[in-house]
């Protein structure tokens, strides 16, 4: 829906996912959307370089969230909320509102 505006559908997915879930890491996005990991790493890098999102480390994992100092953050979130409202309900439930781990599992920890 917004890929023509953002230039790529992965960026749209990342921004909407961050809007709903507040934080994310690349392998979580890969698992949810079933796209290559590199696509998400590249999109997150572009957004971070533009100042839209920031990253911090939680253990060995780089976690991304919206940059609270981004000057157009409130406008961007309002725009994304409006776009999210137009998504079909099954897409909202499948990709954005499902039970998603908020922290990565320790490597090697049994399920």
PLM features: residue spans?
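Short acidic, hydrophobic short linear motifs in intrinsically disordered regions
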Residues: 24-32
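Non-catalytic effector/regulatory segments
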Residues: 33, 47, 56-57, 100-107
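Glycine-centered, phosphate/nucleic-acid-interacting loop/turn motifs that mediate DNA/RNA or nucleotide
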Residues: 51
């Amino acid at each position: 829906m917004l890929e023509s505006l953002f230039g790529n559908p992965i960026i749209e997915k990342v921004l909407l996912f961050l809007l709903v879930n507040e934080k994310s890491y690349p392998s979580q996005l890969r698992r949810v959307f079933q796209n290559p990991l590199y696509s998400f790493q590249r999109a997150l890098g572009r957004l971070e370089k533009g100042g839209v999102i920031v990253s911090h480390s939680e253990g060995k994992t780089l976690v991304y969230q919206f940059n609270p100092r981004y000057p157009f953050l409130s406008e961007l979130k309002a725009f994304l909320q409006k776009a999210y409202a137009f998504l079909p309900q099954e897409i909202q439930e499948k990709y954005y509102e499902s039970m998603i781990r908020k922290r990565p599992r320790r490597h090697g920890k049994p399920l």
